[in-house]
Amino acid sequence: MGLFTDLVLYGIVLPALPFIMRNRFHIPNAELQHYTSGFLATYAGASVFFSVPAGWAASKLGSRQLFLGGLVFLFVATAIFAFSTSLALLVVSRLLQGMSTAVVWTAGLDMVQDTVDPSQIGVTIGTIFATISVGELAAPVLGGVLYERGGIAAVFAVSAVMLAIDLGLRGLVIDKKAAVKFESPCLIRSSAERSDHVASAPTVVEAQERTHEGTPLLPQDDDDDSDRYKIDRELGSIVQAIPLLYCFREPRLHLAMLLSFVQALFIGTFDATVPTEAESLFHFSSLQVGLVFIALMLPYFALGRLAGQAVDRFGTKAAATSGYAFLVPCLLLLGLPEKKLVSKEANVALFCTILALNGIGLAVVTSPGYVEAIDVTTKYQVANPGHFGENGPYAQLFGFSSLYFFTGLAVGPLLGGVLRAKFGYAVMGAVYAAISGVTAIVSFLFVGTRRGVCWG
């Protein structure tokens, strides 16, 4: 629910942002793309800065408390955004929202990871993104309707109600790790018996050693050297404070983070350029711009779970390679509507169809980066019991993953905005198609496969 709320509050202002810039702050039309991209990048930049500290704090303090704090900051940021009377305050609101987003996502994903069976990570991540895509899908439409009918005050009122409900529900959640402290002795004995039974079963690493690419277990690879994940040296003070840093000796973890970066790069670009492109091509209102986002986000909802199952079944290599390869022609098509080869009505349909095709590709590439990163980290955790502390490595992992993701979300609006403003949507699409093609090749060659040695 928290991730859903966060995306709603992010997306609800997207169709209204260019109109707020023009109507409230009198930004000239020629500079709207620059300001819109800048504010989206400010949000993502704050998320980048706070992602790793949020992961560290969650690993030390627990995810539930941090999650609640993130939602409170999100409420404050939304209020400042709604009632700001200067561009400086608007920047402050985006900084606060970016900070709270880093906290909510890092702590939220850690809470999910703590309750999920390792062999179901792909479908779980896919299902989560499919579910929250409903918020991503509905938010721009809702924001367009609310802004057109009641102005920014109506947008804030709905956002505040959603946050209040989420905070109330979050107060009822008991963290899994904290719940163990209150279990009765008989429940603890029962849990211990179950643990003994599980201990006799093969671990994730052992199971993967007996499988090959194409079996339904996490991101399959041919990595059978478990000794390479053992820590056999004295660690420095920084690595002791942030144990996950040691895992970056494994090149696969860097590649997993790269996948998250590229995925977010594309998302940030669409978020920043679709509203201005739709207004420029078709002179759409904020409501109509919001409706255009349905074409991009609907495939997330329809295909997210299925794409996650494919990752669990066929591995991260197949999903990442096919997804980014599929995006290449879809991104190249982005410049077609601006040529106005058909009537306006047909051109609108063409624009939405192209966005939908890109949405399909984005749905496919959602899970591989997360699943690959979790797989590598799990190998280190199994090989080094106790190294990551009582709360495990996953909060720190999601902190670093969020760092890469939000870096992409920050770079996307800036790069996409500049390319669109200087050269047009066709050139922008061609540049991003090249990036997607290179990512597909890298995924085919290196993702989900054994690398010869660790770095460092």
Swiss-Prot record:
Matching InterPro entries: MFS (IPR011701), MFS_dom (IPR020846), MFS_trans_sf (IPR036259), MFS_Vesicular_Transporter (IPR050930)
SUPFAM superfamilies named in the record: MFS general substrate transporter (SSF103473)
Membrane topology category: Multi-pass membrane protein
Region (Disordered): 206-225
A Pfam family matched in the record: MFS_1
Keywords: Membrane, Transmembrane, Transmembrane helix, Transport
Listed transmembrane segments: 1-21, 38-58, 72-92, 125-145, 154-174, 255-275, 284-304, 318-338, 348-368, 398-418, 427-447
Gene Ontology CC entries for this record: membrane
Protein's cellular compartments: Membrane
GO molecular function: transmembrane transporter activity
Entries under PROSITE patterns matching the protein: MFS
Superkingdom: Eukaryota
Job of this protein: MFS-type transporter; part of the gene cluster that mediates the biosynthesis of pyrrolopyrazines, secondary metabolites showing insecticidal activity. Probably involved in the secretion of peramine and other pyrrolopyrazines.
Family: Belongs to the major facilitator superfamily. TCR/Tet family.
Protein name, as recorded: MFS-type transporter ppzB
Lineage: Eukaryota, Fungi, Dikarya, Ascomycota, Pezizomycotina
The gene coding this protein: ppzB
